[in-house]
Amino acid sequence: MTQLLERAGTGSTVLHATSRPWASALFQGRRHIIVLALEGVDASTRADRFADGIEEAQWNLNRHFVADITIDDQRPTDNGVQIELAALTIEDW
């Protein structure tokens, strides 16, 4: 979460986060859904920067790696922008 908030910038908070187990025939990991609130006059610009290249971003996780990450929804709010993203993390053997 810390890395996501750093990427989103000052004035960003986690509104909601869920995580559930995920497995395939060869791998196991977790599926995450995270909703971020970006607030402030520059929220729209920060949201665009946050989303730009997120699929190729490098994440430092202990014993896991990010196999997939996507922005599922991005919408304006009264105070800024709300972003919903999904990520799949896989155990790194």
Walk through the language-model features, giving the residues of each.
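Long, contiguous binding/interaction regions
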Residues: 1-93
